[in-house]
Swiss-Prot record:
The keyword Acyltransferase does not apply. This is Photosystem I reaction center subunit IX. HAMAP family: PSI_PsaJ. Keywords: Chloroplast, Membrane, Photosynthesis, Photosystem I, Plastid, Thylakoid, Transmembrane, Transmembrane helix. GO terms for biological process: photosynthesis. Belongs to the PsaJ family. The chain crosses the membrane at residues 7-27. May help in the organization of the PsaE and PsaF subunits. Its main location: plastid. It is a single-pass membrane protein.
């Protein structure tokens, strides 16, 4: 189990998880606010 937790804390695994979270966040923001360029404040 110690080796598995060490593997999960390596940079490629952490970076992959971060990219997936970022992509999902951008997709959801664009789903609810499709074109923020048309907002005139």
């Amino acid at each position: 189990m110690k080796n598995f937790t060490t593997y999960l804390s390596t940079a490629p695994v952490v970076a992959t998880g971060w990219f997936i979270v970022t992509a999902a966040l951008l997709i959801e923001i664009n789903r609810f606010f499709p074109d923020p360029l048309v907002f005139s404040f």
